[in-house]
């Protein structure tokens, strides 16, 4: 799922050695829309998200990120959820997010605590992440992706491990973020 200003793929390709994972893709993702990227397991969806977010370079072609609001350029333009988000298991969920926010100084502890409530983790925000279920880790990853109000959200399988309430919560959050 993608929520953004605009991302344009220009003949974007990604290879690992001789294996072409993504071949010369062109696409334009418009502002205020939610897109779903679907395909078989192993077809390169996660690789595409990593390239679009800047976590992985393309092999050829380019990815253009257009942000209309100059203020957006001053904050992290992209919030990302990639499968297997890395959190410090010895810290609580809240402490993980506060530590990440301390790096950029874009979110304060009060706002993060409110966000933990929004994603349904407030009863467990002081529990160490090592004791979080898969669904709780996914909620934490979503909170981390949106905590600095990014212009673009790239969410790779954001509903993995979520129960019905978690799915509903994520959909509600995406509706708000879209606007």
Give the positions of each predicted feature:
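A short, flexible loop at the N-terminus of ABC-type nucleotide-binding domains that lies
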Residues: 4-31, 59
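The feature captures the beta-strand-to-loop junction immediately N-terminal to the Walker
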Residues: 38-40
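Helix-to-loop junction immediately C-terminal to a conserved catalytic motif
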Residues: 53
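Conserved ABC transporter NBD signature motif
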Residues: 61-74
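Conserved ABC ATPase "signature" region
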Residues: 98, 109-124
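Hydrophobic anchor residue at the start of the ABC signature
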Residues: 142
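Catalytic Walker B motif of ABC-type/P-loop ATPase nucleotide-binding domains
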Residues: 153-157
């Amino acid at each position: 799922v993608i929520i953004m200003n605009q991302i344009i793929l220009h003949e974007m390709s990604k290879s690992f050695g001789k294996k072409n994972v993504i071949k010369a893709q062109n696409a334009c993702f418009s502002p205020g829309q939610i897109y779903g990227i679907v395909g078989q397991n192993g077809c390169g969806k996660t690789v595409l998200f990593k390239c679009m977010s800047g976590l992985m370079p393309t092999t050829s072609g380019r990815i253009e990120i257009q942000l209309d609001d100059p203020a957006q350029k001053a904050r992290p333009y992209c919030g990302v959820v990639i499968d297997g988000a890395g959190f410090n298991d010895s810290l609580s969920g809240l402490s993980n997010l506060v530590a990440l926010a301390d790096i950029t100084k874009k979110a304060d502890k009060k706002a993060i605590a409110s966000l933990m409530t929004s994603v349904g983790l407030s009863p467990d925000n002081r529990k160490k992440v090592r004791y979080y279920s898969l669904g709780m880790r996914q909620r934490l990853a979503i909170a981390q992706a949106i905590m600095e109000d990014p212009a673009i959200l790239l969410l790779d399988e954001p509903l993995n491990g979520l129960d019905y309430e978690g799915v509903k919560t994520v959909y509600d959050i995406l509706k708000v973020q879209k606007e």
